[in-house]
Amino acid sequence: MILVLAESAIELVPREIWSHPAVASDARRRGKRPGEILLDRARHHPAMAGLEDGARRGRPDIVHQVLLVFQYSLLNRRGLGRVYIHTRGDYIIQVKPQTRIPKNYNNFVSLMEQLYALGRAPPHGDSLMELHRGSLAGLLEQLGGRWVVLHERGARRRFAELGAALLNSVVVVGGFPHGDFSNRWVLEKAEAVYSVGDEPLDAAQAVCRAVAAAEASAGLI
Amino acid sequence: MILVLAESAIELVPREIWSHPAVASDARRRGKRPGEILLDRARHHPAMAGLEDGARRGRPDIVHQVLLVFQYSLLNRRGLGRVYIHTRGDYIIQVKPQTRIPKNYNNFVSLMEQLYALGRAPPHGDSLMELHRGSLAGLLEQLGGRWVVLHERGARRRFAELGAALLNSVVVVGGFPHGDFSNRWVLEKAEAVYSVGDEPLDAAQAVCRAVAAAEASAGLI
């Protein structure tokens, strides 16, 4: 299963709010410049009111949760999975399967800030994570041009069927807190759109069930 | 499904290390006294070297991850689940199903510190979470005296069978980062001990699959 977390709400603090007190004090506290820290709704909420599309931005916790669910899964540990993070503003984060994502959120944030600063992590030796410019369309093309989407309005499948369908697919999940894909074509050109249950699930919940279904299908659980 | 996260690695900083620089500076930075903040391996590692059983302490992120997986699940949202946190040092944290756990880890830590300070959260109105003294044995007795355990050395069951077995059970999962239950009787007196896959899983991974299996069994996914 290749998981693509799309339009993920992770980015460095945009220039237009560098001088906002909520941002400046957070950066100073952490000994960094405002442009070097991740935008975080939990810390920078007062500064985000005027940001375009602000409700869908500043949620690195979504990426953290999904990476924890995926990287520590049996699917990934058995070499049957790979995850790519496509971000708002068109960056692609590649994560090698053996990458142990920090379980502590603050350590994860520091790792992501290093990644944005250097384009790779760790700074030396074999890179485990890499960041480069890239569009969602380009990534999906690179991954073979065929994908399925997990979406609240998708078709319901029995759990076992869903697992079989996802195990060998490129699976796109939205990495944003609210609303829908800005890239409408992701849904329109998908080979299939599946829902997981009858209610909207956040990204980590959807990925948890997709991975469990694929693992059950592969006989891992 | 009633989930009991047992011997969870969450506690306030113990008195013996209040004066350690790593603790004192963290408390000062957060405007709190050392005895009011959660012990956190990611922040207080230098202070924990001499702590008894230190390798199994100071991991509130484990409780956070499990609560996120459980509280935002379809199982819980449909009223088919309930979670209790039993902590190291014998506290019991009760969490009402409608409790929306903060997705941001730092906000979660603040909520837990309020809970330890006041015994409840939020401070006024209907409480959503409550903390009180209590043993694991007392809790399991209160919940009917019959339980199953998820454990790496448990019996493997097909995913569908596991779901059916867990859906209407009290399910105990270890809330500690390493090692095994200190309460050996938890395993010895359990009605059944199940494993999820052939490799050890961290608590959140085990709970993610247990919940997905129970949901599939209940026809929710």
From Swiss-Prot, chains A, B:
> Per the record, where is site Interaction with substrate rRNA?
R59, R100, K103, N107
Q: Which GO terms describe its biological process?
A: rRNA base methylation
What Pfam families does the database record attribute to this sequence?
EMG1
Key words of the record: Methyltransferase, Ribosome biogenesis, RNA-binding, rRNA processing, rRNA-binding, S-adenosyl-L-methionine, Transferase
Provide the reaction this enzyme catalyses: a pseudouridine in rRNA + S-adenosyl-L-methionine = an N(1)-methylpseudouridine in rRNA + S-adenosyl-L-homocysteine + H(+)
**Which amino acids does the record list as binding S-adenosyl-L-methionine?**
G174, G179, V196, G197, D198, E199, P200, L201
UniProt site positions, description: Stabilizes Arg-59 = D61
Could you say which enzyme class this protein belongs to? transferase
**What are this entry's molecular-function GO terms?**
rRNA (pseudouridine) methyltransferase activity; rRNA binding
Per the record, the domain of life is Archaea
Can you tell me which residues the record assigns to a coiled coil? none
State the family it belongs to: Belongs to the class IV-like SAM-binding methyltransferase superfamily. RNA methyltransferase NEP1 family.
Q: What does this protein do?
A: Methyltransferase involved in ribosomal biogenesis. Specifically catalyzes the N1-methylation of the pseudouridine corresponding to position 914 in M.jannaschii 16S rRNA.
What quaternary arrangement does the UniProt entry report? Homodimer.
The family database entries (HAMAP family) matched by this protein are listed as: NEP1
Recorded protein name is Ribosomal RNA small subunit methyltransferase Nep1
Annotated gene: nep1
